[in-house]
C-alpha cells in the first residue's frame, strides 16, 4: 500500500525487491479522497478513538490482502524487540551533556514553537519524560492551560511503573520496555487485529512469539542499535537471504500523509 506522495510510499522499492526474489507482488496506491472517505469506517471498526493514522493504512492493506488470502503474516514486534526505531539511536545532540540540553530547552520555551524548538525542549527533559513525549501535541504546561484543570494524568505518570521496574537497566532497554508494554500491546497489535478482522482475515505476528522475545531480550545493546544502524541482529541475519540494498535500507515505517 502506498500513497500519491512519493515519500509516503515504498511501492516501487517493494516491486524491485520482489522481482529480485521472484515473489509475486500486489500493490495499490490510495488517493487523498479514498483516505478521507475511509475515516468513519475505520473508526467504527476500531471501537475506540485513536490518533495513529497508520490504522487507515492497515485498513487498506487488509482490504487488498482479503481479495486473495484469509491469513496473513505481519512483522509487528520486530522493532520493539530488536531495536528498530530511529528514536532508539543517539544522535549528536542527544549525546551532549544533559545540563547543556536542559539549558537549551529553557531558552526554547520562550521562543515560538516549531519542530526544532519542540525537539530541543523534549531533549532537555529526563528520559522518563522525553521518550514518552515523542508523539504528543502538548507539553504539560500547555496542556494544563488548555484543559484548565490541575489533576490530569501526566505522560510520565502513565509509564512510571515501567521506569521503576527497569531503573537499573540501560537507556535503550528502558525505551524498549515502554514500547513493548504500551506502544506494541496497546496500539500496534490492536490496530492490526481490528483492521484485519474488518475485512474478515486474520493476522499472525510471529515476532511476538515468547521464544523470539526471550532471544531478543538477551542480546547486548550493540546487537540492536549501533553507530546509527537499527535492528543490527536482524539485518545481519537477513543479509544471507536478501539483497544488500534491502537489509541496509533505512527504516521508513508506515507513515501516512496527514
Predicted regions and their residues:
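ATP-dependent adenylate-handling active sites, centered on carboxylate activation for C-N bond formation
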Residues: 1-155, 194-241
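Structural motif
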Residues: 49-51, 166-179, 229
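A short, charged helix-loop
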Residues: 152-165
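Globin-like tetrapyrrole-binding proteins
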Residues: 184
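PAPS-dependent sulfotransferase catalytic core
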Residues: 242-258
